[in-house]
Amino acid sequence: MSLGELLETCRSRRIELWSEAGRLRYRAPQGALDAGLAERLRAEREALLEHLEGGPGWRAEPDMAHQRFPLTPVQAAYVLGRQAAFDYGGNACQLYAEYDWPADTDPARLEAAWNAMVERHPMLRAVIEDNAWQRVLPEVPWQRLTVHACAGLDEAAFQAHLERVRERLDHACAALDQWPVLRPELSIGRDACVLHCSVDFTLVDYASLQLLLGEWRRRYLDPQWTAEPLEATFRDYVGVEQRRRQSPAWQRDRDWWLARLDALPGRPDLPLRVQPDTRSTRFRHFHARLDEAAWQALGARAGEHGLSAAGVALAAFAETIGRWSQAPAFCLNLTVLNRPPLHPQLAQVLGDFTALSLLAVDSRHGDSFVERARRIGEQMFDDLDHPTFSGVDLLRELARRRGRGADLMPVVFTSGIGSVQRLLGDGEAPRAPRYMISQTPQVWLDCQVTDQFGGLEIGWDVRLGLFPEGQAEAMFDDFVGLLRRLAQSPRAWTDGDATEPVEAPPQALPGSARSIAAGFAERALLTPDATAIHDAAGSYSYRQVAQHASALRRVLEAHGAGRGRRVAVMLPKSAAQLVAVIGILQAGAAYVPVDIRQPPLRRQAILASAEVVALVCLESDVPDVGCACVAIDRLAADSAWPPPPAAEVAADDLAYVIYTSGSTGTPKGVMLSHAAVSNTLLDINQRYGVDANDRVLGLAELSFDLSVYDFFGATAAGAQVVLPDPARGSDPSHWAELLERHAITLWNSVPAQGQMLIDYLESEPQRHLPGPRCVLWSGDWIPVSLPTRWWRRWPDSALFSLGGATEAAIWSIEQPIRPQHTELASIPYGRALRGQSVEVLDARGRRCPPGVRGEIHIGGVGLALGYAGDPQRTAERFVRHPDGRRLYRTGDLGRYLADGSIEFLGREDDQVKIRGHRIELAELDAALCAHPQVNLAATVVLGETHERSLASFVTLHAPVEAGEDPRTALDAVRQRAAQALRRDWGSEEGIAAAVAALDRACLASLAAWLAGSGLFASATPLDLATLCQRLGIAEARQRLLRHWLRQLEEGGYLRAEGEGWLGCAERPAQSPEDAWTAFAGCAPAALWPAELVAYLRDSAQSLGEQLAGRISPAALMFPQGSARIAEAMYSQGLHAQALHEAMAEAIAAIVERQPQRRWRLLELGAGTAAASRTVIARLAPLVQRGAEVDYLFTDVSSYFLAAARERFADQPWVRFGRFDMNGDLLDQGVAPHSVDILLSSGALNNALDTPALLAGLRELLSADAWLVIQELTREHNEISVSQSLMMENPRDLRDERRQLFVHTGQWLEWLAAQGGDLACGVVPPGSALDLLGYDVLLARCKTDRARLEPAELLAFVEARVPRYMLPAQLRVLERLPVTGNGKIDRKALTGFARQPQADLRHGVAQAPADELENALLALWREVLDNPSLGVEQDFFGAGGDSLLIAQLIARLRERLESARRHPFDRLLRWALSQPTPRGLAERLRSAPEEGRGPALAAARGVAPAPAGMSRAPLAEGAVALDPLVRLVPGEGVPRVLVHEGLGTLLPYRPLLRALGEGRPLLGLAVHDSDAYLAIPAEHLNACLGRRYAEALHRAGLREVDLLGYCSGGLVALETAKSLVQRGVRVRQLDIVSSYRIPYRVDDERLLLFSFAATLGLDTAALGFPAPERLGQAVQAALAQTPERLVAEALAGLPGLADLVALRGRVLQAASGSADAVSVERDTLYRLFCHSVRASQAEAPEPYVGALRLFVPDAGNPLVPRYAEALETQWRAAALGACGIHEVPGGHFDCLGEALAQSLSKPMPEEASR
């Protein structure tokens, strides 16, 4: 019996245990403590005492009874979950219950009894304050019960009244900060009385409610009853729990849980709606009951198996969830009644004693229910033996390690079995409620079971809007049904999984037990002169093919071919292939196709594995192999007719072996029998009515099993097979020729080929071709848009989706495609073909419920014989079901739909399909690892279903040849750096004295502040919790307080005593003022400038104000945004200058040692550029002399980045980027293995976990890389009382040791262990810098790693795998990421692959490609006055603005003839959209001249279109808007940005880098101003939507994400509607701060203000009042005339009277001068006004899909209650879900990084709030 079981036994027998003065005490009912249990208690005495004393003892604090105290972790979670900002939040943790009371209940007496309860129980007088504290009010007024007198109502009316009360209360969310929180109500009818209780569980839990109801009833029945006074309080209990967190027991439990954390599974993967409503706050209650007899029977059966009834109920719940979870391993969230025996009266106290515990379940483990129940029970008891580290703590740690969302564990099990009744004891037992429902934040499903009312009450509360229709009911019925079976049947406990009744095994079709070539032979005899096949050389009849095959057969038989033998075929696509396979099969042998285009090494592997006796090929392709080679083109046909009959074969003889990609790195041969394949051929021919009138286009290669049907299925029906010319086999225009020439009736291909054909034909709209009557697509996902596009051209084609596996005779499942299927997420997989079965089974072989993902298994007559020469793999994939059937595990995932058909969901293993080719990733990995320098390799799949590509990652071995001794180089660099430190430091004694004086001043200030807590006046030690409460220290600052207390200990102010501290009697007496004066008097100004001293003093003297939030630490350091204090701290001091020069000299020495090497530098936490200035200045001469340097300056703050861009604008080799050291290092745009020198000045210490940071940074370092780091190397008290207030708490050994900084030795240890092979410090011990606590640290890393270019490796692999298997990306990593269980983390690799690689690879400026780029580059340099710019330089990134770009366009039109052909505003928009010389050159090359209409196809010669996009010219007569702009190339679904009111993409510039995400980023911008203005305003948005949708559609896009800001949101809405009509899928529609103006604007002043604000002009300088004042005036005017803002409505505001002058000021500011570009600026203004007028149109027709609305949290000063107005408008604009999200900023400045992060989340997780 474990300790947990022993405690549970005591609890079940109502035995109370507690410790007292080191002794074990107990209180037990008569007879409860028998001899055996007493002996167990004695044996476990020490363990019990350790458990009971696991935290501090009980401490009653009656004098603090009415002081606020903290929330428990669960209470805090409940309060936080009330916030609607969280998914699945926005509701209280609340129970609503109704109880029947006698009809004659006296309301006054019941009210008096209630108030007696309020007086007795403090938590009935409690409130929540500031969402973080709870407080018991000392006195409260008499609480009146709400009484509904309904005696005059009949039964129906009374029931209607009860429904109204229930509707009001059952989801109530009480105000926790207002007493009373609990407000019972009473409804008194004619013959009934009902008590309504809406209880917020934040204050009292379910067990407390039962105690309360029992005492309340008892007091009502006996008003004289008085319970013994309560000496224990919930507040005292919380105090114990708070102190317990400092105990060894808490640390032990924490270590135990964290050791398991990485292995814990996630939440149950239950099927959810396509768009679950994450904002829903409504729940539905399900209830069932086992009567007392059934419950006792279940308990008895549980006992027979050594289980408790409560454990069985939990196991049954886990079993049910496991049945419906798509992941077999998951965590359940258990609510635990946490009332430890800390005090004898604690069982009578009301409060929320709830704790949470995560229970890991793996539903695959255990062959019977009993085994699984035992395993769950054992795990639960293990968990409950470590209770002090709470489930909430664990969830927080999960979120920290795995990211946001990992802490959502929404499936809850709440058991009151035994525990509630034990708690109630012999008291008044409450009655069962007549109705009950509960809600909990962040919970999807809460299962509650209790036996307190006799029998077992079963309740589920399920959040609405999440699960598909009917699923919750089905799950609940499964659970209840399982409990009933366990109560009734002994077999339910011990039998394995009961399988569903199995239908009879599928039967083969009559006539299918024959050779697959028999049908061809019959047709050859029946119609010998009919055409059998066409190829590039001509046509051949059945007779000709048969005669040639007969000749080949004779030769092959001479070489040993016959039954049981195999012959390889290696021929190009031609009629010879059909001849070869017929001849081989006529000989009784099996054929083995070998693709002639495959690399020689792979061909050799296939031939060796297949053990062929002969090879059929062309004379020109005879390979050097160990078998006979027969040149088919040298054989003459047999003249005899009819040919001899085929050799006899059995139905189960081998027909062919097709090799597919193999998981072991070598191809695997799939062996198919004649009977298996013949069944499929016969079914397809009958199903689709194939006959001699059909012509099949044979696109599939012979090595792809679709060709089996082309050659044997089609010819068996007498059809003709048409083969493409192998030289044009991938050319869709050639396929179109064949369609036309041969009138193809049957199309059989992978979907990608069908899409290629349609893509081509849509670029040739005038070409009309006959279409196939029947289309078979298989082998890969079918894009849902493809059928619609196909039907648009050939509406009479019957389309079919087929699926299966090479291991199961070509196809096994079929789905006729209907128009409604194109509206789904994917085309359904369908139902099994005849003679076959296709099932979705879970990990235990059970048929999955509808909607639950499982593995697809194929059975029936079509199964392969196995894999050639590989019995082990055959046994792994071809399995026996428990019912005896042989099944093939496909590795494909699927689920049943409601109608019983199957939906395909992808793969579960490392096998993928790329454009129809089945690829084992392991084979590619093996080819990569064959390179002698590659150690490990891993490949992942990128992209959506039909746009997939591969990304491979490798790690390298150590280099074979040893180079220079790394120590020699390190020492040489150290010496160079040390020389740079030499200077006149003055007296070292004086420096040491100043450092000591500074420490004393800081400690004196700390002690003075701490005195306010009463610490120095207290005679007893004060612990940390007490100090935090008295000083108002938040939990986040407790670690800093611990550090300060330690420093004061060392300074002689305090001494530690137990868990607290006492003031020292002989502590330093120096006042803070005197101490700071003393320091200022001895501090050398060269080291501590006066401004720095003043800052340190001010910060130390205002600690209380800073901690309370009254003074901002950042504002102290950067007063009014000035960096002068930071300059004094980081740049001006003599020590700072010396340290930075040492860093610079070290880096120069490193570069000079290998001048031919390209050096990529990454500076972390560059901040004010204090070190960067010196380093860059030192490197600049080296760059000028030819050194190739790429310097990336990074910081987490945009403030510092902006300043650095300006400072280093003259250094084109210096780039800038945001980098967060505490974020995911591999998710910030810096590619792994790409940094040669990493430098940092004083920043690494700011990391939360510096060793982990160094380990992560190592991933970024290339082979033979360097680290150059400057850091603080002792405790700096001046930092602890200043900048530490802006720093987060460290999580490494600094936290354990209560330090802020570490010494040089620790830094070197970290570097040696994590970041460098060799490391050293530069500063000599005892020197001035050492006394000051600084050092420069050098490390040389990865000297044992090889250098290998990806291009070299790719060329190596190309010789070993087919081209379709080559990775699109190939990257070198330091190590492959692994999951917690040691497996390669492919999710992390996919994240790496989606990161841009350009940041550290393209540092060298590219030369202009032609004269146009050269001319534009010259203009760029001239206008920006920067001769070092390159053709990829962003105009705005180099310091440009709207004025300068207008000047650039003006000069461009003066100097370039090609530019003069376009109007100014078109050129301006192009430049705004693509603001680089190369980007603008692309537009000029591809654009038509004025008046000619666009020609997007011309762009093909300049740059490739984005992935998934095929550019095509518009039809003749199309409006010349040419709106489509390519912003960022990439792969995947493009994101399209829709222009705002100016017609440009300028506002989106802050988002471009963040939104690239490795996928295409396109823009829609106004191309022709006149055409834009010609559209009536009331029709503008709809018209633009149609035109833009047409442009996107004609560009070949079939799936997009749309983003519209401001008025662009309205255009985006219309574009989305039109795209859907054209069959283009709008995956996401994102609207940002877009407002339809509900009134007409006749006062131009408002338009001018909005125009100026949109351009970013200074509106105050232009004479406008503050935006808030302007908004007030607008609202005042609209109050008079709500439908329009009349002219002159705003004229009374200061500065706005003269409209003409105001307009002139705005337009002049817009163009930059009074005269220049006046026409263009006026056009821009006209465009803007036109867009505004369009925004005043009537509300549009709603969009049928979903959208996301992003609302700026600062609102729009011109629109009151802006968020509410936006939400109202956009909810009405979409029939689908409308997700509402707040983003930082106001309307004019909300397009920032926070918005980019929000946009990155996919729409399927959005829902209506």
Swiss-Prot record:
- Which residues are annotated with the PTM O-(pantetheine 4'-phosphoryl)serine? 1442
Tell me which domain of life the UniProt entry assigns to the organism this sequence originates from. Bacteria
- One GO biological process from the UniProt record? toxin biosynthetic process
Segment Thioesterase: which positions? 1584-1797
Q: Which residues form the Carrier domain?
A: 1407-1488
Question: Of which family is this protein a member?
Answer: Belongs to the NRP synthetase family.
- Please state what the protein is called: Pyochelin synthetase PchF
